[in-house]
Amino acid sequence: MTTAVVFDYGFGNVRSMVRALANLGVDTTLTSDYRQSLEADGLVVPGVGAFAACMEGLKKVDGDRVIYDRIRAGRPVLGVCVGEQIMFEHGLEHGAHAAGIGLIGGSVNLLDADVVPHMGWDTIETAPDSVLLNGVENERFYFVHSYAAMEVKPADTSRFDIDLSDSPERVSWCSYGRSRFVAAYEHGPLSATQFHPEKSGDAGSQLLKNWIATL
């Protein structure tokens, strides 16, 4: 049976993700144990709250090391919501910069919109040949966030002894207010979504099925 760990570091709607994966036949564990998180077929990194607080919580339980070690070994990782944001190099909240995991080049900033947070269902500009969004390219997904990454830059992952240069980088986008932001990111074993697939009905279930098929 396919196994997955939903990483439990104190931030995120973990129970809903555990249920969503279990309902798709995945043997799912909620834990922050390093060995279990490293050895599972898939790792989900959720996240809700402030970028800096999530990074602090992640580091307290060696979550950053788990992510680096899995990506280095080619083992799939899925970041969701702030779990996507922390994969970027930096986050800017309330005028303060915080360092992220750094596997995606760029920074996370406040959305430029009259109403924040961006909350509700929205469509996505799907990247060509997207694996995650295959079959649900024109569907709507559920978002709830105030910050996002507005661009993707080249990331120097060599400092982590990680080389993803042989893998295509696929970026899907969403627009809200005056911002066009990263809605989904795929690069080798690293996948991430700004929206919540576990709260996105049938389309979200199909996305999770697509990810599970890569494990």
UniProtKB/Swiss-Prot annotation:
SUPFAM superfamilies: Class I glutamine amidotransferase-like (SSF52317). Its EC number is 4.3.2.10, 3.5.1.2. CDD domains: GATase1_IGP_Synthase (cd01748). GO terms for molecular function: glutaminase activity; imidazoleglycerol-phosphate synthase activity; lyase activity. It catalyses: 5-[(5-phospho-1-deoxy-D-ribulos-1-ylimino)methylamino]-1-(5-phospho-beta-D-ribosyl)imidazole-4-carboxamide + L-glutamine = D-erythro-1-(imidazol-4-yl)glycerol 3-phosphate + 5-amino-1-(5-phospho-beta-D-ribosyl)imidazole-4-carboxamide + L-glutamate + H(+); L-glutamine + H2O = L-glutamate + NH4(+). The active site is at C81 (nucleophile), H196, E198. Pfam families: GATase. IGPS catalyzes the conversion of PRFAR and glutamine to IGP, AICAR and glutamate. The HisH subunit catalyzes the hydrolysis of glutamine to glutamate and ammonia as part of the synthesis of IGP and AICAR. The resulting ammonia molecule is channeled to the active site of HisF. This is Imidazole glycerol phosphate synthase subunit HisH. It comes from Bifidobacterium longum (strain NCC 2705).
